[in-house]
Amino acid sequence: MKVMAFAKIAVRNKNGAPDGKSYIAAGDLCTVSDKTLAGLYPVTYPTARGSKTRWVASLKGFLCNQNAYGGLSYPAPGYLSATVKSGGCGVCAAVNAVGALTGKSVPVREMRDLAIRCGARVPGGTDMKRLTGQLCKTYGLKCVQSNHLSELTEHLKSGGVAICNTAGRGMFSTGGHYVVALGFLGDKLCVADPGLYAGKYSTARRRAAVRVSGDLLLTDAATLDADCVGRWPRYYLLGEVN
């Protein structure tokens, strides 16, 4: 599974000891594999001398989080004081998706401006149909809209990512919200929730279905699909143009 690092991340050797001479840099496109028997995630990342593999105890640092952007305005008619924190999950979902697909670290301000210019900023959120259309033009991507879990699963296993349109059924949000399906680690779907905050998944229902590892979520694909029921489309399947 590929994912963008959004912060400097400390790493360990395969035995779990800290490796003070190595680190993952913000902007690195990384390949993360399922946990080892030692409970560590292998991460392969670029260096000046080629790729290197080290290990991390959790998936912290791999998320563009809208909660960090309370000072970045994202106005819409009727929501003139809105910010990326209050209404920009779609913006940060797009940053997470583009980073994982292309290795391009897109500044949130740049993605915010893109959403506004293309008319994707609407009262209450982001028009993802319009924004993904612009992402395809700007970053050389392709997008297929889908309502089928089987198509989502096949797409992720072939190396794509998906922006997922949750319906506020209480698992990932109590209101409409965008999250990103990054791929699978073992049999679990790895999800980037741009609205993640401390304690969000600590309720009994969420805790039973979703495991938080650092800044990313691990869950069953069916759990995500159930939370998207009622949305059309449920999934924006994004991939690079061959």
Task: Give, region by region, the residue ranges found by the protein language model.
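Short glycine/serine- and small hydrophobic-enriched flexible loop segments
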Residues: 28-31, 95-100, 137
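Catalytic cysteine-centered active-site loop
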Residues: 104-152
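Active-site-adjacent substructure of cysteine-protease-like catalytic cores
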Residues: 142-200
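Beta-loop motif signature
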Residues: 2-48
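Noncatalytic regulatory segments and standalone regulatory/sensor domains
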Residues: 184-242
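Boundary regions of SH3-family modules and the immediately adjacent low-complexity/disordered segments
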Residues: 44-61
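Active-site-adjacent structural segments surrounding the nucleophilic cysteine of cysteine proteases
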Residues: 3-4, 21-24, 58-121
